[in-house]
Every structure is written in C-alpha cells, then in structure tokens.
C-alpha cells in the first residue's frame, strides 16, 4: 500500500475513534436509564448519569422507588457511570 493510502487509512481510523460514542460497556447498564423521580412526594436533590451528554446532572428525587441511576452525590455518579 502506498504512503498516501496508509495516511488516508490512518485518518479514517482516527476520525472513527473520535466520532464513535463511548460504549455502554464502559459503565453499568443502569447508567443508561432515564432520571426517575419515583411516585413519592419528597424533594431530595439527587444526581443521575445522562448518557447522551456523558455527564452527571442534578434532578429532584421523590424519595422512593425510581431506578438505580440515582446517586446522592455527583462524585458517586461520576465514579460509577462517567469514569
């Protein structure tokens, strides 16, 4: 293969790596769940991982049920899902 062809291949592979989203295998599956306040009426500040933005965001948790994508601190959320 010519050096031009190798450069093109290298460029395409680099572009693929940049544009390909992080695989959900990099964190637990529950990190892909949407924020869920649950049916209770409490007003608790909690954090959830937002897979599209690939960051942890705050939401209001009602205090019961919901799902596993629910953390008391942003640090706990980041350690679990955004690492």
Swiss-Prot record:
Function: Serine protease inhibitor.
Signal peptide: 1-24
Entry's family note: Belongs to the venom Kunitz-type family.
Tissue and organ expression note: Expressed by the venom gland.
Cellular component, GO, one term: extracellular space
Site (Reactive bond for trypsin): 41-42
Molecular-function annotations in GO: serine-type endopeptidase inhibitor activity
Ranges of residues in domain BPTI/Kunitz inhibitor: 31-81
Disulfide topology: 31-81, 40-64, 56-77
Keywords, alphabetical: Disulfide bond, Protease inhibitor, Secreted, Serine protease inhibitor, Signal
Protein name (record): Kunitz-type serine protease inhibitor carinatin-2
Subcellular location: Secreted
Primary location recorded for the protein, binned into one broad class: secreted
């Amino acid at each position: 293969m010519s050096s031009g062809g190798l450069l093109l291949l290298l460029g395409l592979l680099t572009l693929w790596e940049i544009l390909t989203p992080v695989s959900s295998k990099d964190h637990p599956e529950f990190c892909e769940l949407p924020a869920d306040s649950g049916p209770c009426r409490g007003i608790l500040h909690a954090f959830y991982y937002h897979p599209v933005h690939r960051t942890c965001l705050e939401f209001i948790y009602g205090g019961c049920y919901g799902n596993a994508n629910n953390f008391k601190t942003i640090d706990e959320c980041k350690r679990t899902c955004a690492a």
